[in-house]
Each structure stands twice: as structure tokens, then as C-alpha cells.
Amino acid sequence: MKKLSQILNLNKLKVVKKNIHKAHGLPNECYTNDDYLNIERKKIFENKWIVIGVGSSIPNIGDAKPFDLLGIPLIILRDKNKKVRVYHNVCSHRGYKILQEKCKIKNVIRCPYHSWSYDFNGKLVATPHIGGMNKHNCSKFSKSESGLKAVSYTHLRAHETINH
């Protein structure tokens, strides 16, 4: 990750803290530069608990919805034990976004791209045609290493929070 001094002229930031009559807003790079956004994400959100919703928004077993945390796609899901789970909304096969909108999941979380399927615990359970036409298994591929990536999560006073 780049340092702030590699992204913008630090003198531009000093002007922000000046007396109100001489101060300026943040430089344009702070709003348009991806490297700056990455630094900001790290400083503000890394290793901190962040509220991402309330459990009542997914009250029933199988209720699921996508959530975008500053460009990081997540899935919030109510599992079969009524526990809330949070995963990265990215299929381990081709990186495709699994959920596009709020939905009700019956048995598996299925990627719309190649139908790779995950159970409510994030475990990869189906890999259609991975070994060729109508061959759904491959001895050289381990499903156990390709599940959905879980996000640290807790329920705090009716709020769903993650530590990313």
C-alpha cells in the first residue's frame, strides 16, 4: 500500500487545518484517488467493529441480502439455526458477486455464474462440471479450501457488527 506522501502533496493537507478564513477543503485527490480510499479504509475501518445493519432486516431462516462496505461486497444471511452470518459476497470460483439483491435462500447459496453452491455455513457443496461435462468432482480440487470467506461478526444491542 502506498504512503499518503506518495499520493498527494502533504502541504495541501496543512491548509485544511488553518484558520477558517485561510482554510481550504480537502484536495480533490481525497475524493478521486483509489490509493487514498485504501488508506482511508485502513485507518478508519481496519480492526474496528462496524455496524452493518439490524437483525430484524433478515428475520427469517434463509433471509439474505447483499451489503456494500466501501466497495467490499458482503452477504448478510440468517442460517438454519437462526444465527446471522456474514460472508464476502464473492464466489471462490471466478470472483463473481453471488447476491445481487435481497432474497430468500432455501438450501444453498448459489453463484449465478457457474452455479457453484455453498451451504449456510459457507462450505462449498457443489461444483458443477468441474471435472468436465457432467463430472461434478475432481480429485485434484479440494472443496474444503474454497468455501465462502467469513467475516468476524457479532450481534450488539440489536445491531449487526463486523470486524474487517
PLM-predicted stretches and their roles:
Residues 1-101, 149, 153:
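N-terminal pre-ligand scaffold of iron-sulfur
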Residues 85-142:
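Long, hydrophobic, well-ordered secondary-structure blocks that form the structural core
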Residues 112, 147-149:
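A generic structural signal for well-ordered coil/turn residues at beta-strand boundaries
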Residues 141-145, 152:
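Short Gly/Pro-enriched turn/cap motifs at secondary-structure boundaries
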Residues 155-158, 162-164:
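Single conserved hydrophobic/aromatic residue that forms the stacking wall/gate
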